[in-house]
Amino acid sequence: MNGPIIMTREERMKIVHEIKERILDKYGDDVKAIGVYGSLGRQTDGPYSDIEMMCVMSTEEAEFSHEWTTGEWKVEVNFDSEEILLDYASQVESDWPLTHGQFFSILPIYDSGGYLEKVYQTAKSVEAQTFHDAICALIVEELFEYAGKWRNIRVQGPTTFLPSLTVQVAMAGAMLIGLHHRICYTTSASVLTEAVKQSDLPSGYDHLCQFVMSGQLSDSEKLLESLENFWNGIQEWTERHGYIVDVSKRIPF
């Protein structure tokens, strides 16, 4: 296995159409639509990019996938019923800016009834309150927890974990910003560079990202100071935008 190897877009698309024909031969009328997503769907694939496809099925509760490599290239094909796919497209979790970009750049390969457009419209039409709730949950479930971790490191170590924790905090901050602006990042590799270009960032976020993007993660004191500044910036930013985190003085159940 010596891959992935360099391939052209034309070579990838030839494979896509071979897979499409195999899907139609195997599942026949059960197939409603087939599309390509990811960099290939956006037409921004690089020489080593993989192939990602989605298949909308008429079978209720269909939900399975195939992922394989030939040793030279890799493919993932997800099979979902229309109901399951639409439900997932309407969900907003903390990683929505990374997971749901697929629904905004689907390249249709086979679509007998406009199903992929329906998926796109569903993802596009999520209510503002859903994003609001996801932001509040991210602050509590991820960022608040990370703050406890870096404060523990300041008190008792180990500082060896601080560089990777700083990367995690920067990524969580990017998810916060993506949810606020309701944008999906192009790729996981471009998350931070795209996040810092957005308007209305929490104070301290850009400075924190500079450490991560430059790889300057060896000075523990500077990292801890930057993390605290970002956390303070989040407090002011959330209050300004009305993201009220529920605080319970008692056990809530």
Swiss-Prot record:
Its EC number is 2.7.7.-. Mg(2+) B binds at D50, E52. Residues 128-241 are annotated as: C-terminal domain. The keyword Signal does not apply. Transmembrane segments: none annotated. InterPro entries: KNTase_C, NT_sf. Mg(2+) A binds at D50, E52, E145. SUPFAM superfamilies: Nucleotidyltransferase (SSF81301), Nucleotidyltransferase substrate binding subunit/domain (SSF81593). Neomycin B binds at E52, E67. It is an enzyme of class 2 (transferase). GO terms for biological process: response to antibiotic. ATP binds at S39, R42, S49, D50, E52, E145, K149, T187. Homodimer. Although some of the cross-references in are mapped to other bacteria, they are probably all derived from the gene originally encoded on plasmid pUB110 in S.aureus. Inactivates aminoglycoside antibiotics such as kanamycin by catalyzing the transfer of a nucleotidyl group from a wide variety of nucleoside triphosphates ((d)ATP, (d)CTP, (d)GTP, ITP, TTP and (d)UTP) to the 4'-hydroxyl group of the aminoglycoside. In vitro, antibiotics without the 4'-hydroxyl but possessing a 4''-hydroxyl group (e.g. sisomicin and gentamicin) are also modifed but with poor specificity. The 3' position of the NTP ribose ring does not tolerate large substitutions (e.g. ddATP) and dNTPs and TTP are better substrates than their NTP counterparts. Bilobed; the N-terminus has a 5-strand beta-pleated sheet while the C-terminus is a helical bundle. This is Aminoglycoside nucleotidyltransferase (4'). It comes from Staphylococcus aureus.
